[in-house]
């Protein structure tokens, strides 16, 4: 099972995927400097690290990225897991946002949110509280699990796919995701993420596939 074809990569050596939009298009909510560091340096470093870790590991070179994540988690290969998972998580995040996104979804996503959280407003409040409650670095996810949507948070490089949960949306709450533009105001960043960034079409595609 592939959890997300856009976030997965099928073959070694792995690459830094291009952003699915121009980095300038997120002004004023994200500056180009944020993308230069977050995508060009942080994300890229995970790619380079993983390729170096696998250069003499032919058995792992045959796996796709999701396969490496699952294998390394099961076999306690922490360094391999951290870098592989961070590649996947970041790519999933880039698709979770888009210029002029956010606001209220429609269609199947809105119906599912209303059913599982009571209202879109209650969903937003719970999402924000989970994001603010993540101590230190991590991620806040919306997953489809046991036939319903859930909001969960993971620390550091952890990812829900190792627990057989289907991610449909993620917000990066590592400080490098927002510190250049928002400093220590994670709350402001989360508000902007919800109101101006979420790519609801990507969320819908993940929900129905």
From Swiss-Prot:
Which protein, by its recorded name, is this?
A: Superoxide dismutase [Mn/Fe]
Query: What EC number(s) does this enzyme carry?
Result: 1.15.1.1
Binding locations of Fe(3+): 38, 90, 172, 176
- Keywords of this entry: Iron, Manganese, Metal-binding, Oxidoreductase
What are the required cofactors?
Mn(2+); Fe(3+)
Pfam families per UniProt: Sod_Fe_C, Sod_Fe_N
Iron found in the keyword field: yes
Catalyzed reaction equations: 2 superoxide + 2 H(+) = H2O2 + O2
The cofactor note reads: Binds 1 Mn(2+) or Fe(3+) ion per subunit.
**Please, which domain of life does this record's source organism belong to?**
Bacteria
Query: What GO annotations for molecular function exist for this entry?
Result: metal ion binding; superoxide dismutase activity
Enzyme class name: oxidoreductase
């Amino acid at each position: 099972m592939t959890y997300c074809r856009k976030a997965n990569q099928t073959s070694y050596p792995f690459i830094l995927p291009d952003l699915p939009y121009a980095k300038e298009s997120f002004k004023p909510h994200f500056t180009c400097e944020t993308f230069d560091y977050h995508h060009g340096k942080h994300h890229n470093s995970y790619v380079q690290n993983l390729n170096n870790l696998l250069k003499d590991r032919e058995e792992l070179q045959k796996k796709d990225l999701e396969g490496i994540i699952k294998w390394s988690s099961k076999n306690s290969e922490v360094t391999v897991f951290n870098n592989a998972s961070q590649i996947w998580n970041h790519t999933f995040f880039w698709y979770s946002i888009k210029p002029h996104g956010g606001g209220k979804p429609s269609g199947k996503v809105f119906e599912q949110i209303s059913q599982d959280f009571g209202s879109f407003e209650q969903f937003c409040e719970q999402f924000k509280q989970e994001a603010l409650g993540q101590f230190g670095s991590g991620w806040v996810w919306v997953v489809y699990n046991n036939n319903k949507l859930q909001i969960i948070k993971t620390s550091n490089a952890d990812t829900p796919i190792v627990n057989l949960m289907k991610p449909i949306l993620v917000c990066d709450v590592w400080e490098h995701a927002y510190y250049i533009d928002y400093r220590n105001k994670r709350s402001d960043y989360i508000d902007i993420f919800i109101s101006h960034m979420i790519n609801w079409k990507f969320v819908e595609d993940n929900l129905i596939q």
